[in-house]
Amino acid sequence: MESTHALQPAEALETMRSQTVLVAGAGVAGRGVISMLCALGARLVLVADDNAQALGHIADDGDTELRLLSVSDAIDTLEELAPQLVVTSPGWKPESPLLARAAELNIPVIGDIAAAWLADQAGAFGQPRTWLAVTGTNGKTTTTAMLTSMLIADGRAALAVGNIGIAPSAALAAQHRGEPRSDVFVAEVSSFQLHWAPMFKPTVGCILNLAEDHLDWHGSYENYCADKAQVLTAEESVLALDDDDVLTTARAREVVARRGYTIHDPEEVASQNTERVVGVRDGRLVEVVIGDPSQTTDLAPAQGISPPGPAGLADAAASAAMARALGVAPGAIEAALAGFKVQAHRGQVVLEHGGVTWIDNSKATNPHAAEAALRGQRNVIWVAGGQLKGAAVDGLIRAIGGALKAVVALGVDRAELVAEVSRQLPDLPVTVIDATDPEEAMRAVARAAHGLAQPGDSVVLAPAAASLDMYTGMSQRGDLFAQYAVAYAGADRADERTQERG
């Protein structure tokens, strides 16, 4: 077996069909891989200490031989098992004992994205699909959904896969069983998934932005950027021209990208190698051929995009640039953006009442995401705090200080956040919520924010921190924010404009 980097589709498919394959992890990704390998008739060893019982019905779909092992048993017997390939769930670190042991035995280790892409490109499920890959520190889900909408509006059989929902391996297996085929996979891919996919080469790839994140997993920011950069091996790379770290990463890898995007005028930011840039001119989203102003294509209005603000506009520009790389018609881009509504917890307006807008951006779980959520806004009552996980907030406060009218802080690391706000913005009103019960805390947040807000203000939940200190996840945090916004803003009348959550 060749090295993981050199693993080719035909070789990988032959291994999946005729050799023993070990699957590490039984989460969403692991279950998707199992269903795909079952469709291929693989000999499987599933390693999982949890959720193994949920997999029994999957093996009934074919003649697959499936053996279940605990992690410790798999480590002890790995040499005896002699798998020719290990497919790991994305969260498993390279130094995990099982994966480290596989490396010692020179067994190739790949992830769920790589396994699905290799099988698909080898023709295991019919004509290979077109893959578009979206990654970045923030904005991946919104951009993936926007891009999928544009492709569908253009008449393409497109499906959003990866972190946004269905695992691509599960989608391949489902279509193998007779469900409608998708010819285009729009994949939201994480740095973890890309680490385990060194051979992955999508048709179109884009890094939306880069900031320090998941350093405990990757070991350094350089490693994190290197894993993200895997999408830039695409046949057509799209560069985020407003993000210096993305451009630095691309230059370090000598990426030649003919396409890019910006939220500014395309001619003002285009790099020397970029030929076509999507950007904003005269209130319109346009695609410009650099150096030839006569070749400007109008795409859509730059106003009214969901989510509002620069972050939403950047996602729309990225989506449009990737769509244009596949030849999507301008009318389809405009129609998709006109009908697009951001998913819950990603800049969703949950209430407009009394001239005050309440915005749920609970997904902003790190300082970079919070900065993106608040950039360009004014008169903001900022709801922030939770688990900072060691992240510094001084740069964030410096960047968004001009947008803030007041701060309501909660969560286990609220003191650190409040201290930095007080140091940089000593005159800014700050309310500290000491409650640790999730409902009580968010009830107090909404009460305080309602008391501070005046017509023309926005109350924005953009925590800059993880949620697990009090909440089951960012979804519960956002749901409770919306619930108590309605309660304290007095929006129980029938004519209130509360947007449907979903």
Curated annotation (Swiss-Prot):
Known catalytic reactions: UDP-N-acetyl-alpha-D-muramoyl-L-alanine + D-glutamate + ATP = UDP-N-acetyl-alpha-D-muramoyl-L-alanyl-D-glutamate + ADP + phosphate + H(+)
UniProt pathway: Cell wall biogenesis; peptidoglycan biosynthesis
Keywords associated with the record: ATP-binding, Cell cycle, Cell division, Cell shape, Cell wall biogenesis/degradation, Cytoplasm, Ligase, Nucleotide-binding, Peptidoglycan synthesis
EC number per UniProt: 6.3.2.9
Location within or outside the cell: Cytoplasm
InterPro entries: Folylpolyglutamate_synth_CS, Mur-like_cat_sf, Mur_ligase_C, Mur_ligase_C_dom_sf, Mur_ligase_cen, MurD
Residues annotated for ATP binding in this entry: 136-142
Disulfide bridge map: none
Pfam family, one: Mur_ligase_C
Keyword Calcium: no
GO biological process: cell division; cell wall organization; peptidoglycan biosynthetic process; regulation of cell shape
GO molecular function, one term: tetrahydrofolylpolyglutamate synthase activity
One term under GO cellular component: cytoplasm
Keyword Nucleotidyltransferase set for record: no
Top-level taxon of origin: Bacteria
Major site of localization recorded for this protein: cytoplasm
Function: Cell wall formation. Catalyzes the addition of glutamate to the nucleotide precursor UDP-N-acetylmuramoyl-L-alanine (UMA).
Family note: Belongs to the MurCDEF family.
Protein name: UDP-N-acetylmuramoylalanine--D-glutamate ligase
